Amino acid sequence: MALLVEKTTSGREYKVKDLSQADFGRLEIELAEVEMPGLMACRAEFGPSQPFKGARISGSLHMTIQTAVLIETLTALGAEVRWCSCNIFSTQDHAAAAIARDSAAVFAWKGETLQEYWWCTERCLEWGAGGGPDLIVDDGGDATLLIHEGVKAEEEYEKNGKIPDPASTDNAEFQIVLGLIRDSLSVDPKKYRRMKERLVGVSEETTTGVKRLYQMQYSGTLLFPAINVNDSVTKSKFDNLYGCRHSLPDGLMRATDVMIAGKVAVVCGYGDVGLGCAAALKTAGARVIVTEIDPICALQALMEGLPVLRLEDVVSEADIFVTTTGNKDIIMVDHMRKMKNNAIVCNIGHFDNEIDMLGLESFPGVKRITIKPQTDRRVFPDTNSGILVLAEGRLMNLGCATGHPSFVMSSSFTNQVIAQLELWKERASGKYEKKVYVLPKHLDEKVAALHLGKLGAKLTKLTPSQADYISVPVEGPYKPAHYRY
């Protein structure tokens, strides 16, 4: 794979699709800044003191216009930054170009192969002879995974000379990861351990990545502290819900131009993401059906007037299928073969294994007809009918559209900045062990408060006697940690 790092005139490393798109990217970044009051408030509050001076931050998170504002907030606070995308289709090339030219090292472009994707992830983590990053901003956990797998392989190699064998797994993507680590062993057999020793911690953006972190914590294999940004209320109850409510129909319409009204739509999963997707489809006039494993979530859907059925009950009746579960094997090839002609199948969970894309690709005689980028018709030979698969089973709102809008991402990314500041500030105190943490309630409330003025809100103030009556401080936090918003 002949990929070469390029350098700007100032000497900054990068690999993007087209650096000449930087001016266009800069114009959209300036528009987004107006819609991201939380991040701009962070610049105003912390910029003068440069709290990240001397810090190296590596980010693996969708390289969009909104992420560009996050990156430039980190650099405005003094950090050096290297960045890659966490999805092969989610990069906005003009955003990547603007950041590469003006602010940070970027390795990302829309339409990467899996080999290119992991090459970009490796470049993002490499800071030269001094080791790796001090901090990681992760989305889905791939940067964290690469370091953990690299350390594991180096230790086995030092102990018994064992070299990772890509043929030891059937997972095509993990074969690439093992090959990457195998090649690094021959050049620098201590690279990932140096990264581990330098790392202060990671802040994780999304549900899937958080699951990975907790799995490592419970198994005792987590190598550094982690802050779970996803479960901040101002992330999961806003980005996951309202962001998806906005970006799901945007992706559907850009990809297919289909009229949603009157269609039967199946939403697999009714967590925060599923709730937002179902609300969007219902508002657009679709007849929405939910599938669920959790009786509480199922009851919530029923209270919203949404039938809860099994996929097998409705697979031949529905027009649109959306997976939102964060689990695997939700829609299988046998389901797809029973669907209506031109039924739309898409995923808004982080990885591509909610839909059985491997089984679809390998099904005998199936024909792939590309309508346009990230919109493919798959025709089955025995029925001569087909389905429309969006973004190859990956995140359709970023593959087929531009993802969540700036305002809701400001809330999520303000949490990221606060988490990174907290990890860096406490790096020598021992406050954070090799465990997963969440941000305290008063910081969650602060993130929300930073976004109220933009929408013209005016908060009512508690009197001291009112605060005493309900046993909360006048300035908050107003809810206990266990409160369910």
UniProtKB/Swiss-Prot annotation:
Catalytic activity: S-adenosyl-L-homocysteine + H2O = L-homocysteine + adenosine
Gene: SAHH
Annotated GO MF terms: adenosylhomocysteinase activity
Needed co-factor(s): NAD(+)
Binding, substrate: 64, 139, 205, 235, 239
Purpose: Adenosylhomocysteine is a competitive inhibitor of S-adenosyl-L-methionine-dependent methyl transferase reactions; therefore adenosylhomocysteinase may play a key role in the control of methylations via regulation of the intracellular concentration of adenosylhomocysteine.
Source organism phylogeny: Eukaryota, Viridiplantae, Streptophyta, Embryophyta, Tracheophyta
Keywords, comma-separated and alphabetical: Hydrolase, NAD, One-carbon metabolism
Induction (UniProt): By infection with B.cinerea.
GO cellular component, one term: cytosol
Source species: Phalaenopsis sp. (Moth orchid)
Domain of life assignment: Eukaryota
Keyword hit for Repeat: no
Pathway this chain belongs to: Amino-acid biosynthesis; L-homocysteine biosynthesis; L-homocysteine from S-adenosyl-L-homocysteine: step 1/1
Record note on cofactor: Binds 1 NAD(+) per subunit.
Protein name, entry field: Adenosylhomocysteinase
Keyword Hydrolase attached: yes
EC number: 3.13.2.1
Primary enzyme class: hydrolase
Gene Ontology process terms (BP): one-carbon metabolic process; S-adenosylmethionine cycle
Gene3D superfamilies: Adenosylhomocysteinase-like, NAD(P)-binding Rossmann-like Domain
Cysteines paired by S-S bonds: none
Family: Belongs to the adenosylhomocysteinase family.
